[in-house]
């Protein structure tokens, strides 16, 4: 029943405004092709309060961390990582590097088929022209064994630059992403 005009229908939207419960809007999605070593999101609109990347990834060789760069800039990135695997915890820091390094986010190519690393990456104040850009990542992967680099990680980083972010390049230590890899960029209202 339409609340606007009283029309009866099997569709709950007949005569009513569409209902959109999400604060997230899809901007772009990329899927690995087995040969690309970098995936770039370009022409990012400056109309959101922040950005979120949702990642499921696997490398064709080796594994462990996503590298991230903004606007093609190769300087001014600092990252801190805390990771654990159930037996031990590790803390790492990288200062003034050419990338943000986000650990525990890319599954190893030697692991069982269809095992992927998962990560949620939040990019704050991306459209600001007065603030440096901060990033938070929660990631994990598990091969159900005692393999190296499995576990969970919390990473935080900063790009020391006040430019608005209009492109994001994602890599993985120089190796390519498999065809099962997906990166989805969302704008947060």
Question: What is each model feature region?
Answer:
Residues 2-189:
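Surface-exposed molecular-recognition determinants
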